[in-house]
Amino acid sequence: MWGQTNMVDKKSPLIAVSVGEASGDLLGAHLIRAIRKRCPQARLTGIGGELMKAEGFESLYDQERLAVRGFVEVVRRLPEILRIRRELVRDLLSLKPDVFVGIDAPDFNLGVAEKLKRAGIPTLHYVSPSVWAWRRERVGKIVHQVNRVLCLFPMEPQLYLDAGGRAEFVGHPMAQLMPLEDDRETARKTLGADVGIPVFALLPGSRVSEIDYMAPVFFQTALLLLERYPAARFLLPAATEATKRRLAEVLQRPEFAGLALTVTDRQSETVCRAADAVLVTSGTATLEVALCKRPMVISYKISPLTYAYVKRKIKVPHVGLPNILLGKEAVPELLQSEAKPEKLAAALADWYEHPDKVAALQQDFGALHLLLKKDTADLAARAVLEEAGC
């Protein structure tokens, strides 16, 4: 752990970062790289995943312990999550970082930020919560909790500005990093998939709790597609070692004995580019599929209690980011009771068998890519270092 210092050397600022899931780990890794380009001596600590640690980040706690989704699922783990948050606040108040950056995971990170801001430590939140979709009353509280919000989508900053806060659109890092052009042939060669066969990608989530709900449904869907397309190949990128282990456990069930599935270590972009169509849970992964210009079917199941709560609160007609950003149902969303293998398989087959529909969708996804494409990591790094006084 970095030692406490009474005098701050702005050439080597101590930057605290906290992430709660795999998508935040990716954002954090890009942010660290950009910070180090501007300030090579920066020191970084807090909570991070494997990608951040590969960039030299010192993680004080296991990021996987925070990776849960849904009201019921969070309640089960709440005592542990609250303990980690208390201990992180204690550690950071002792270390006195020059700035704190919470990346996504707002229910965890905004509580940390509020306590640190009260102690005089500048705070930023990177990735606005979906206040435009539900719980818009949170905006005023977030303005109180952090000094600045870094937004990934263009409709978000004005909500904070109207509430007297500071916010800016920095673009989405995936749009910056992913090429605009499509290259399915190269992706298939990389993964050893023949160009002439049907290829479907399965993305059942980056959290173990998501795998438990979605992997069995996705695997049953794959078996139905295999009946329709006997030569089909199925690809699945595992976000973390923990999800990879859980996927292996599900695949060992007798009902999936006939399913040949290629599980990759991450490589989600390559997997999506190689696919003719993608079955994906809601969340950031849907945007990655869109930026790969691939047709998709969005599906999600959570506990009935969680779903009933969310359905009452949500203020937008869609759950998938591509549909929300395009303002229409460009791709199917089959949720909860609609998330049946028969329906999912039929929707994926519809994309595979109608290339004209795919071509029109790719035009929409290309325009969306251009809208979100900025030098995101550098813009975020500049804001972080400004708040740190560098």
Swiss-Prot record:
Q: Which InterPro entries match?
A: Glyco_trans_19
Which BP terms in the Gene Ontology apply to this protein? lipid A biosynthetic process
Q: Name one GO cellular component term.
A: membrane
Q: Which is one GO molecular function term here?
A: lipid-A-disaccharide synthase activity
List the Pfam families hit by this protein, alphabetically: LpxB (PF02684)
EC numbers: 2.4.1.182
Known function: Condensation of UDP-2,3-diacylglucosamine and 2,3-diacylglucosamine-1-phosphate to form lipid A disaccharide, a precursor of lipid A, a phosphorylated glycolipid that anchors the lipopolysaccharide to the outer membrane of the cell.
Q: What does the similarity note say? A: Belongs to the LpxB family.
This one is known as Lipid-A-disaccharide synthase
Q: Which organism is it from?
A: Neisseria gonorrhoeae (strain ATCC 700825 / FA 1090)
